[in-house]
Each structure stands twice: as structure tokens, then as C-alpha cells.
Amino acid sequence: MLDKNQLEKYNQEHLYEYEKLMSSNEKNALDEKVDQLNLAEIQDLYQDLYVNRKTIDDVSSVSEVKYEVKSRLNEEERHTYEQKGYEAIRNGEFAVLLMAGGQGTRLGYKGPKGSFEIEGTSLFELQARQLIRLKEETGHTINWYIMTSDINHKDTIEYFKQHKYFNYDANHIHFFKQDNIVALSEEGKLVLNRDGHIMETPNGNGGVFKSLKKAGYLDKMQQDHVKYIFLNNIDNVLVKVLDPLFAGFTVTQSKDITSKTIQPKDSESVGRLVNVDCKDTVLEYSELDTDIVNQFNNANIGIHAFKLGFITSAVDRELPYHLAIKQLKQLDENFGVVERPTLKFELFYFDIFRYGTSFVTLQVPREEEFSPLKNKEGKDSVHTATEDLKRMDLI
């Protein structure tokens, strides 16, 4: 049975009332789950990120990152980078890591977001085609690591099976799941999902490296003599997956972290890649004062290459949580299903940057390499993604 005094200490006494209405099996499951939780840490998260949340309005320690602009590279530089990139890919120096833990809910679609199809071509297939082309050009089959989540893991694997892995070698596609963390109400209370269990949500893309390690894939990369991990997410329909120019730029610069960015539009709600206290990092749009956000010229588009040695040395180090507030369905006090604002705590992959020692950025043309698919209609929508894919002759 739940410890009422312990629950009251951490503002979770409502669970004691819930328990009175539960069956024996439900009570046992709730008790077991609560025993696994560190209620003090959960309360600290709530206080730090919600009650005392703040934006960054002091930018005295924030400066522009060092970056090169792709459009300013001359033909000789482009050729040199591309040839070095092809050579590195041919020699097996790169693995590709895709973050694809989301659902297509905001697109009005029930399956994994990566399985969403635009005129018959899914987001997964758009990326698989590029890996197939690289294999044809280099003779090397790149290992493709795909991070899923509890909500879409089985469906993602099944989708790949149904589509015969898009003619890519299934032995070189590796799926693994990100971890979860509890969600809270705006009052700081644990909430129950529709099944009557304590609600947990994916812990954000920042868990990608620990999850990769837990699955044994960091060890595999070392055994395969991989030197770099190319990282991207499923949202960007124009992503150039491990394009040889960027691969060559990465190898030539030989930094812990190599990033792609675009020039942001004024007040565009996308994170800014900046330098803070001599470390590159991403400041989320929501964390920056609106008067400050337009001072910086590099918008983060979630495309990076990491030295494997850097990731293995930093993977176990602590990352901070960030707050997101979402409308989520849950049980109310009478076990009825309601939709309420819910606090989600997320890790961001770019917080690992703080442990790096060397950084470089390549700013690329937005119209060629960035078209996020986030909404069913309007901005960053199915329509805009479709138009951009057609413009680039990708569908």
C-alpha cells in the first residue's frame, strides 16, 4: 500500500485517493511503479523548470558560432570536400543515426511519423533512397541506426518489413528505443494515463546516445572502426543524409562536433546555434528573449556529425531537462478521460555539446536542405513539404 505521508511530502497525495478505487492488480502495479520513482527529484524538476522557469535575457556570454557558408565555397573546395567525403564513406568511417520516435498525430495520421507518405513515398523511404545511392557510389553499405519510442517501435519495424526495408540491406538497419520519464500536471502532480498507469512520455531526443549505448550499438560502432556519427531527424523532408560534401567537410575539420545550419528568418521559432562560454550549443527559441533571438545568424536544423570518440567519452555525463507543455489525455479524479495541459520533461541531444572541445559549422541554403514537416495544414505542412520535394525533384 502507498505511504500516505511520503506522498503528502511530495505533493502526490492524490495517488492515495486513486488507489482506493483500484482493483488489487491495479494497486500492486501502482505501488510497484511509485517505489521505482524518486519523488524528490521529480519535485525538483517541477520547481526548477515550471515554477521558477525563466528565459535567457542576458547574452553577455553568448556569441556567434564560427561557421563557413556553403554558397561561398569555390569549385575546388567543393570538389575536395566531396572526394574526401566519398573516401571516408567508402572506408566505413561513418554511421548514420536517425531520430524517429514521434507519431504523425499533428499530421492527422496515426502511425509512426516516418511512415507518413507524401504522394506514395514515406519519410523513411526518402532517407533510405539516399543511403542506397551512397552504397552504389562507394560500394560500402552504411549502418543505419534508427531511434524509435515505446509508442511506435513495433509499428516502425513492421513498416520496414512490409516495405522490404526499401531494398536496403536489413542487416545494416538497427532499431532501438529511447527511454521514458513521468509527466506532471500543472500543479506538479503525477497523472494517470487512460489505462490507469502513471503517465510516462519519451524523454526527448537527448537520450539518444545513452539509448544507443544501452542497445550495444556504440560498442558495435567501435568494433566496425567507425569514426563519425551522422545525426539527423525524421522531420526534415529535404535532409541530405550524409551528403559527401558535408562528410568531407567533417573529416577535414576533424572537430568533436560538426553542424549544419541555415540563416534564420526574423523571429523564426527555431533554436539558434550559438557559442556560450567558448562552447557551441543550441538555445531553444522558447528560452530566448524575443528581443535577443534575432541577433544570431545560425538556426539549428538538427543535422550534425559527432566524433565517435567524443560520444563514447561523454555519453554517461549528465544532461539537463527542458520543459514542454502539451495537451494530453489522462484520467480525472473520477477516472473519466479528459484532455489537460501536461508537463513533459525532455532531454535535448545538443546539450552534450557542453562536453566537446572543438566545433565547426557549415551554413547551407534553406531552399535546398530544410523543409520541416510538422503540421497537417499551414506552415511547415504536408502542402509545403510536397511542394519542396517536387521542386527538388525528390518525388
Curated annotation (Swiss-Prot):
Enzyme class label: transferase
Coiled-coil region: none
Keywords linked to the UniProt accession: Nucleotidyltransferase, Transferase
Matching InterPro entries: Nucleotide-diphossugar_trans, UDP-sugar_pyrophosphorylase, UDPGP_fam
Highest taxon of the lineage: Bacteria
EC number: 2.7.7.-
Binding site for UTP: 99-102, 113, 178, 204, 235, 344
Molecular-function annotations in GO: uridylyltransferase activity
Pfam families per the UniProt record, alphabetical: UDPGP
Family: Belongs to the UDPGP type 1 family.
Name of the protein: Probable uridylyltransferase SE_1761
Source organism of the structure: Staphylococcus epidermidis (strain ATCC 12228 / FDA PCI 1200)
